[in-house]
Amino acid sequence: MVAVAVLAAGKGTRMKSDLPKVLHQLGGYSLVERVLQSCRPLAPERQILIVGYQAAAVESSLAGRSDVEFVEQREQLGTGHAIQQLLPCLQDYQGDLLVLNGDAPLLRSETLENLLATHQRHGNAATLLTAHLPDPKGYGRVFCNGDNRVTQIVEDRDCNAAQRQNHRVNGGIYCFHWPRLAAALPKLSANNDQKEYYLTEVVDYLDQVMAVDVDDYLEINGINDRKQLAAANDILQNRIKDDWMAQGITLINPDSITIDDTVVLEADVIIEPNTHLRGKTVIGRGSRIGPGSLIEDSIVGSDASVLFSVVSQSQIGDGCRLGPYSHVRGEADIQANCRIGNFVEVKKSVIGAQSNVAHLSYLGDAMLGQRVNVGAGTITANYDGVSKHATVIGSGTKTGANSVFVAPVQVGEGVTVAAGSVINRDVPAGSLAIARPRQRIIDNWQVPPAPQSGQP
């Protein structure tokens, strides 16, 4: 039986932001969301977030999580003081408590599982996650005997010169037997440089305290400023991209590519340089994305290509060709084997299979049938200044260059729309629609001569 407490009360002054530190984003999730995700495989009985600075904003960010409780630390007087706030709500709890930092989002679930298993196997009062750092500056040092039993923990700011030579550091991740921890918490003092209550002091009041080393010391990295946030993003991205390449995905110039860990890539996908895949995006088998493309919360079918284009909240069918420089957004549905060409924007529209929108067009709130050919410069005028209106174009229709459809309007199947037409009435199937002024020619026309210099 395990409960989880996440320390999320700090302001994060070094972030230089009005946003609480734990709400800064890393790969599509806030830092604190990533911490909560890491402990999900443990199936904790309770998850408690200890909040303080902008508590309402932090709670609001997790409003959809009914499994998360909140406890407020009104004054931020240290990690020990934060855990003391749990005494009332856990007074009858008899299990283990896992303590995590809300600004340490790189922990792997496997690391926490190993920490908990070691703690329970040895019947420890406390088990600490430790790491051997090349540069331990800023971290508390952990001193152990030969059996990994902890004898002392000293915060970095309180270390003397000899203690600073120890590179085994406290990762700030703990597993406690709660009843024994609860008995020790009232004994904490603020007898240190910061006048804070350190959770590490409980080691002095507990027996059987053990340290467990993390395999990859980068997992314990905390985030205190923008530089560390950028470094964490690099670490996360390298993990994600290494995993995908191991599964048979081709990444050309991986350093220029970013992929959220919510993205799904099917076999034989190729990702070209300077491409970014975000949110709940799925890329189908054999598709080629990029270079220079952004796809967010969208589904791309098999054997499709997206070149120098932006796709958001939309669906792209099998065999489609997008780009260069197309923009598909707002729940658009591009069905199989369509071509969406250069400088084309499609918004909240359905484009039927085998249709072509090759260049310089805007289709908004439109529904196109199959095999529609949209001429260059075709526009759906869908907004009347108050409301959006639909344009319906039937299968097999061809629109001439520089056509405008003033919605709401319906065009039947097999229609030909003459170039330069402004269509503001419904057009029956199988017809030719011409809606433009007649061409006028004036014979023997000469451009008037330009005025000479000095004349008005």
From Swiss-Prot:
Q: Which reaction does it catalyse?
A: alpha-D-glucosamine 1-phosphate + acetyl-CoA = N-acetyl-alpha-D-glucosamine 1-phosphate + CoA + H(+); N-acetyl-alpha-D-glucosamine 1-phosphate + UTP + H(+) = UDP-N-acetyl-alpha-D-glucosamine + diphosphate
Q: What is its main location?
A: cytoplasm
Q: Which residues bind acetyl-CoA?
A: 376, 382-383, 419, 436
Extract the InterPro entries matched here: Bifunctional_GlmU (IPR005882), GlmU-like (IPR050065), GlmU_C_LbH (IPR038009), Hexapep (IPR001451), MobA-like_NTP_Trfase (IPR025877), Nucleotide-diphossugar_trans (IPR029044), Trimer_LpxA-like_sf (IPR011004)
Give me the comment on cofactor binding.
Binds 1 Mg(2+) ion per subunit.
Q: Where is this region: N-acetyltransferase?
A: 248-456
A GO MF term: glucosamine-1-phosphate N-acetyltransferase activity
Name the GO cellular-component terms: carboxysome; cytoplasm; membrane
Swiss-Prot/TrEMBL keywords: Acyltransferase, Cell shape, Cell wall biogenesis/degradation, Cytoplasm, Magnesium, Metal-binding, Multifunctional enzyme, Nucleotidyltransferase, Peptidoglycan synthesis, Repeat, Transferase
Residues at which UDP-N-acetyl-alpha-D-glucosamine binds: 7-10, 21, 73, 78-79, 140, 155, 170, 224, 329, 347, 362, 373
Q: Which Gene3D superfamilies match?
A: Hexapeptide repeat proteins, Spore Coat Polysaccharide Biosynthesis Protein SpsA, Chain A
Chain positions covered by the region annotation Linker:
227-247
Cofactor requirement = Mg(2+)
**Cell compartment(s), UniProt:** Cytoplasm
Q: Which domain of life is it from?
A: Bacteria
Q: Where is the active site?
A: 359 (proton acceptor)
Which pathway, metabolic or otherwise, does it act in? Nucleotide-sugar biosynthesis; UDP-N-acetyl-alpha-D-glucosamine biosynthesis; N-acetyl-alpha-D-glucosamine 1-phosphate from alpha-D-glucosamine 6-phosphate (route II): step 2/2; Nucleotide-sugar biosynthesis; UDP-N-acetyl-alpha-D-glucosamine biosynthesis; UDP-N-acetyl-alpha-D-glucosamine from N-acetyl-alpha-D-glucosamine 1-phosphate: step 1/1; Bacterial outer membrane biogenesis; LPS lipid A biosynthesis
Entry keyword annotation includes Metal-binding: yes
GO BP of this protein: cell morphogenesis; cell wall organization; lipid A biosynthetic process; peptidoglycan biosynthetic process; regulation of cell shape; UDP-N-acetylglucosamine biosynthetic process
Report the PANTHER family cross-referenced here. Answer: BIFUNCTIONAL PROTEIN GLMU, NUCLEOTIDYL TRANSFERASE
Q: What does the function comment of this entry state?
A: Catalyzes the last two sequential reactions in the de novo biosynthetic pathway for UDP-N-acetylglucosamine (UDP-GlcNAc). The C-terminal domain catalyzes the transfer of acetyl group from acetyl coenzyme A to glucosamine-1-phosphate (GlcN-1-P) to produce N-acetylglucosamine-1-phosphate (GlcNAc-1-P), which is converted into UDP-GlcNAc by the transfer of uridine 5-monophosphate (from uridine 5-triphosphate), a reaction catalyzed by the N-terminal domain.
Please give the subunit comment from the record: Homotrimer.
Quote the protein name from its UniProt record. Answer: Bifunctional protein GlmU
Q: Which gene encodes it?
A: glmU
